């Protein structure tokens, strides 16, 4: 969840109504007001609506929801004459670049704070901690086009933002706060990404820090936006969201030529939805014009096409719209959840905690007692992480996403160990030892069940530590187990064992293979243990029956 600060003065100016009305209706568009202060409110939004991570984005949505300004915003993008070239050497470092010029701005301190907040929120929600995408905002009048996005020597120096003396790029990774926080994204590469202008002045060292030369202030009238990353869609979506926010702040967007290609494309996408399908899903009886009117409140352009079809133009900044049902969800928001009729279920049942959840809770207590810290990795992952980096064959039973947003999230997780190793990779520059675990659902084919997994990473991690964790789990779960040597390319030969209960394998333990460790860019031995909680429950059920 993302919390943003909404200053009342700026927000009411953008929306055109009073604070009380805004605070009363704001939760209706999918927000949770965390805190109300004298001059601002802190509001939480779900990460699937990154277009609402700024005061400008909230104002745009609220104007529609309140009926002040409905329908979609038309973005007229003219050529700026500004161009970028990309160094081919960046292909293996940080290959993708998006850009735009925004002119005619008159920024207040509140507007600047809103843009900085949007920048950081997008770094988290879309950029995955700046790995997939990072944003730079520059005062265009302080630099000279054309610009180059190049791979520079680590010894290149410039004055970073909020500093007064030049530093080398290598120094920044050790001495600048942002450098220390994000050094792991670039340190392994022989050269670092850099954006320079026609006079070879540094604009930015993405994804670390901008140069102080291009600092955006209340005097800034024209902005150069750059978005770099390792994921092209994340880069493109981010450019659209930031451009749309800056239009709300009073700017006009102009395109930038990147190696001959114009950026950005702010045209809407078009979908045709069924009124009948929407009514069945929501339990309503809306006509096509009525549903179109509701969609206009949500800032779509909606045109009835007969009695059962609506042509919907989806704004460029709505990256969350991937299915017709996403549009119907906005119909429900505009209709008002408070206006739906409440009905009681025909049957009444009394719930209780499932046995698998009980076992999962016991596993968490045991591993916490052993010094492991619980983490919650994503449910979506990729075949690269799940199979390729684990040196395993790809499984035909993996559940694939039909329309994945990124190459990092193409399947539903089938295992937990790869995700724990990925988390170790993300934290590889942190202090050792690192001991983490997780419990949760995995999916194979159409079967969903729960597993638990734990890893320990440090210089002395070995098979004995993995066995000790497995023994503690089985002992405290009252599992009469035996072990048997087994093989798996993810583990070192001769250092992997199955946990067997009543002739059934319920888990594994062992020492991770050096090939896997190196694949995840780690440098230390790793001990691992994994339990199939479904199998543990089956044993308990059989024991209880006998």
UniProtKB/Swiss-Prot annotation:
GO terms for cellular component: phenylalanine-tRNA ligase complex. InterPro entries: aa-tRNA-synth_II/BPL/LPL, B3/B4_tRNA-bd, DNA-bd_dom_put_sf, Phe-tRNA-ligase_IIc_bsu, Phe-tRNA-synth_IIc_bsu_arc_euk, Phe-tRNA_synthase-like_B3/B4, Phe_tRNA_ligase_beta2_arc, PheRS_beta_core. GO terms for molecular function: ATP binding; magnesium ion binding; phenylalanine-tRNA ligase activity; RNA binding. Its cofactor is Mg(2+). It is an enzyme of class 6 (ligase). It comes from Methanosphaerula palustris (strain ATCC BAA-1556 / DSM 19958 / E1-9c). Its EC number is 6.1.1.20. The keyword Transferase does not apply. Tetramer of two alpha and two beta subunits. It catalyses: tRNA(Phe) + L-phenylalanine + ATP = L-phenylalanyl-tRNA(Phe) + AMP + diphosphate + H(+). PROSITE patterns: B5. Signal peptide: none annotated. HAMAP family: Phe_tRNA_synth_beta2 (MF_00284). Belongs to the phenylalanyl-tRNA synthetase beta subunit family. Type 2 subfamily. It comes from the Archaea. Pfam families: B3_4, B5, tRNA_synthFbeta. It is found in: Cytoplasm. Keywords: Aminoacyl-tRNA synthetase, ATP-binding, Cytoplasm, Ligase, Magnesium, Metal-binding, Nucleotide-binding, Protein biosynthesis. Mg(2+) binds at residues 320, 326, 329-330. The lineage of its organism: Archaea, Methanobacteriati, Methanobacteriota, Stenosarchaea group, Methanomicrobia. Residues 266-342 form the B5 domain. This is Phenylalanine--tRNA ligase beta subunit. GO terms for biological process: phenylalanyl-tRNA aminoacylation.
